[in-house]
């Protein structure tokens, strides 16, 4: 993956043991990340370090170690704060990870979280002082997204095919929808560990004419698919991972003027307002009813799509970037 970035951004690829296995590599990256981070810091005289947190990898731990050595502040951005609950050896692993994640976050100079729910979670679960936690939402470049063609019967999901996304719940609704609206299409963008099982489910239910797996799609192509759709699908399973989370894909749906459907208690209320820019549902049966309702009611679809477009303004990357700059300037001034 070679993203096109601003010429001022330099990518340094750090070799990591076990790099063919992402999860193992993420747990073995500390030494090389620390060593090279310190080297780069000494060469470039950075003002601060910015790191992205995830419960299973040690990059933020390496960032904190680099910050200590270089005597510069560390900002850590948290989106996925915790794992799903586990049993047996996995549960023991989670407990060990919680110990080092707690120490890492406690040593960070500023922790950025997307909302009040995550702020409280990071404070309670990792014992991080509320004084160092600030709310900075996720964002998207809303100018890149065109208003969707709300006259199509296309329902879209964009994202990783993980269990907690609940794509199986969406597939359970397909037959009910297609009986009522035979030409409806369910387009799935993305890849992941559940992909093959989901494909088996589609063939088993004989709904392959209405369900299209696109696999991994270049980010530049996503706006095109969204503009051809009428409904965006958010998280369809309520877990520790999805509860009150703010997936960027949902902001992209909103920027495209799509009504959104998601399982109750997943998306924050400033992203999905029930009956205003979409619906929260409780199961696949209610999901199918809401899809049918939206596809059959052009005016409702239009009004909800316009509400999504209006609500997404505060999540424009231009606004989010300003908040990150303010936080970094404050952290730098406090560290002097």
Q: Which functions belong to the PLM regions below?
A:
Residues 293, 300-314, 323-326, 330:
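A short, well-ordered alpha-helix in the C-terminal region of glycosyltransferases
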Residues 112, 147-174, 187:
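Conserved donor-binding/catalytic core segment of Leloir-type glycosyltransferases
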Residues 38, 58, 65-70, 82, ...:
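Membrane-proximal helix-turn-helix segments that form the acceptor-binding/catalytic region
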Residues 38-58, 72-75:
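Short N-terminal targeting/anchoring amphipathic segment
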